Amino acid sequence: MDSLTSPLLPASATHDPDPMATPAEIAAVIALAHARRARTLVIGSGRTPHALATARRIDSTWTRAGGITLATITWPETAASWLRQATRFVAPAPDLWVMTGPTTGWAQMTRRLLWSTPWPPTHTLATATLAAPHTLTLVGLPHLNGLTGAAVDGTTWQVKNDAFIP
């Protein structure tokens, strides 16, 4: 696996769409968490209106299903380093992490997590907004092996063997 040469993206931030997760997508994220026998989650999201609403919906659905949310962490689309957010994201040591939000902020946060923390993609679930090939290549597929997520229709996807598997 090629190492990241910097936790920051080489290009400046863009203004990405801010889609809301569908009910089927949220149900699939919760089902994936249950299938992995998770009891605790940390939910991370961008700070856009739909990302925040999606994080709240995941939290409430998870809690109603008997799970425990240890923390909800947000990150900006642009920042100097994302180190503070990355440190707060991994500190509670949940069974699983869940991530949602616009592309650029997620990519920057994920690169910082890989660069500065013991965060493993194998213990992370993501929403459909993060499944686009151009999004995943901002971080690099070899760095995301094991990342699993839900599509808008409730089907699931995974990064495995350096490839996106729908």
Spell out what each predicted region is.
Residues 1-16:
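Flexible loop/hinge segments that line or gate small-molecule binding clefts
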Residues 12-74:
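An alpha-beta-alpha
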Residues 46, 158-159:
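Short acidic/His/Gly/Ser-rich catalytic and metal-binding motifs that mark active-site loops
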Residues 51-157:
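Extracellular/periplasmic bilobed ligand-binding domains
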Residues 161-166:
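Long, C-terminal catalytic modules of enzymes
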